[in-house]
Amino acid sequence: SDFSLFNLGIPYLYPGNTQEIIDYGLLAIAMSRFSGAWVGMKMVTDVCDGGGTMEADPDLPAIRFPGGYQKYTDPRLVPPITLALENEVNIRRLEAVRQFARLNGVNRQNNAAARVGILSTGKTYYDLMQALRDLNIRDGIRIGKIGMPFPLEAEFAKQFAEGLETILVVEEKRSFLEMQLREILYDQPAHPAILGKSHFPPIGELDPDKIAKVLSDVLGIKDRRSVPSPQSPAPKPQGARPAAFCSGCPHNRSTLLLEGQIAGGGIGCHTMAMRLNDPSRAISFLTQMGGEGAPWIGMTPFVDHPHIFQNIGDGTLFHSGYLAIEACVAAKVNITYKILYNGHVAMTGGQAAMGALPIPELTRKLQAEGVRKTVVLAENVEQYSDLSVFASNAELRSREELPRTLRELPSIPGVTVIIYDQECAAEKRRKRSRGQLAEPTMRLVINEEVCEGCGDCVRQANCMSLTPVATELGQKIRIHQSSCNKDYTCAMGDCPSFVSVQTKSGTGLKKNSLPKLPPADVPAPRQMVKAGDGYRILGPGIGGTGVVTINALLATAAWIDGLSVATLDQTGTAQKGGAVVSHLLLSEQPIEAPAKVNAANADLILGFDLLGVVHPGNLNTACAERTVAIINSDVVPTIDNIRNRAPVSGPGQMLELVNSVTNRGRNIFLDANRLAEGLFGTHMAVNLFMMGVAYQAGLIPISLDAVEQAIEWNGVDIERNLQTFSWGRKYYEDAAFVESVAVPNRDRKEAVPFDRVSELREYQNEAYAQEYADFLEKITEPSLKETVAKYLYKLMAYKDEYEVARLLTKPSFERGVRDMWASAESVSYNLHPPMLRRFGVTKKLKLGAWFRTPLLVLKNMKMLRGTPFDLFGYAAHRRMERSLIQWYRDLIEQVQTNLTPENLPQALEIAALPDQIRGYEKIKEVNVAKVKQQAVEKLAALKAAQAGLLVVGS
């Protein structure tokens, strides 16, 4: 930006905080009107994404205008008049700008008598001030703040340099101020030494810590800062929290391709499909906004691939994407545009796209532009009652027809279009919470005993609400109900475990009837910290859960109390479930520091997300003598955990890491997700609940009245939010009481002892269970016996039609479903019976509550299993499942024969191989083939190792 504006001859101002955005903005407007020049403003992320208290006096800034300058312009852009215009733009106007800046004090200095001066600008100036504060440097240095980096005002620069021996220029990126300063001072007598890029890198951004290090070197002083040095290694099982498509996001499904197909990426939420490393979303290139599909025009003559898909969001389409489509039509290339029509510009706040057309009108426009065929894939086909409004070459289909459409359109020469019509999931959720959209009454529940943990539902839905859980029966998938967005795509997984629950309209998850906490029930905090000249709060959390809202509530409350406030919300793609970090600076004095918490400067870490807390950049803000941590100890799965079906590691190592760099004795760790969902029925209450805990601990220097007023001003679910805050305060005072009130989290069922022998008795009969027990008696090594007990059971209790019927009608499951919902009216079963597949039934059938009776009948027919009357048992798949039982017994007997203390770990690996035999039908068959191959290789290695030991021993 600096050099672009410089080359264009455009003066610009550089605000470093919220106050300066207003002040400099007004100055820039006045400067432009006075001089006739375009005047720019340099805005950086840390300023734009921040906020704070400011002086809103309409008479400030007091703007003065120099005299003696007359603007000149001439519309005749031909020589020799252009010479006069060049003089106007590059000389007269810039000189007028300098005079204006000088008269209005746009650049300022502290006029200290000193040998060393430091010059800086914008956001970096406030980083400099924080660095000086961290180094405890209060005076003896002349500080200059440049409000207008270009053109650098020469008179100010000369006055600033007077009497100095050294000037350190603190600026980001390439030398710019330093370059201008050298040019101004070069011919001055006894000019000072100028340092800058000799000490600061020309890339990346500067922060107070980098600046403090350079100041220590230049000034020859000791760095007195206390920077944390963790005593424990950083936990390796978890990485950073990447952004992901929201639960129920249409892009989870719309970006899918068939095998061998490729797509181009573009600008929008759908770009995140690139980081999934998923062959079924094979994105080959990424373009600028509005260039979607254009690279294919140039690539087509040089590649053998005959066709490509191109993803494009509706916001981009209506902004500039039409041009690329028109170019592809003109170039006669074979391309299918996937217009991802979700009705909102979701990546940047959910606003409506400017110039948006209704889908029927859009199909007509595309036809007029030369598009050969358009297929509209709609979530709700019934909304289009009059098909005549669509273009004649357009066809309306259900979104379930995506695979068919992906097969058909590449065969049509030229440009074709898929319009995937499904509203943004985040906006749906927001509308539902505000009562602007009806809440669906159908919910899905996974029967975890039927679930095989194969992850096919995850492959279908790519949904953040499908969380992996470790159970006694192995890894399973569970729907996190309070974050589920009711998209239902997961039920397309090839698995009979999904049960549809029809709830009464206006009801949902069963909520605890909480007694209201009167103010007298929670005393005022016994001791409260003071804001003083700077109290800093760091809030790492998960995007979309209200972290930014908490920061805004606290900032508002502090303003009500008369404190100075500065905030920064580092969000990035946080709205999509990625990491978000909020920074809050409270002070009893005017703030001249960045809102961003730097190394060893956090007073409170309000850790809404443990993964975010242990990120090195966030841990670096802690100081063992200063920082108190209030941490949500629950580890929420990342999209990588979910896609890879990897259970989340426990919090132990990460919490110990937090303790090692903070005030261990004052820290509070709590499973806030379990408590919030137990108390309020939703994970969205977590952050406000934790804010209440921190407040009652005396760690938020704001009055109770101000906090409650800020919650009221927010205007959303006021009474419940006040109660959430109060219950968090109550938890600090009496954790045991709050724990006793919170209902057990419905998504975290307590483990109960699992009796495999009894289950096999229910599965078949006493003899079958005894057969299992007898085989286990043959195994003497305890750990091997424990492993075989798990996986022999898994293979013996294979889930045929009789067993699925038994598990779906199991009283404990049916009771759990009823207890989960405030008003469950009926249950339906989503089944794709193998027998019907042979007759061409290609998708699941939704069978209503009436089907429970046939399931009970089928369950009681288990005595037919394995007999000549078992019609299901004749299927090749069932024969394979039965054969696995004897295969595994033979495998274990061979392992036992070759077992030694030395090869026990390898033996346990072999015994646990059936854990990988997951899924139903084709999915299971593929896994069986892989496991059998592994068994052959591992058993051969075990025998070879045993043979080697015998040779050595002899």
Indicate where each model-derived feature is located.
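Active-site loops and adjacent core secondary-structure elements that bind or stabilize anionic groups
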Residues: 98-110, 114, 708-954
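Active-site cofactor/cluster-binding pocket
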Residues: 360, 365, 500-539, 545-777, ...
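Flexible, low-complexity linker and terminal segments
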Residues: 15-245, 250-251, 259, 267, ...
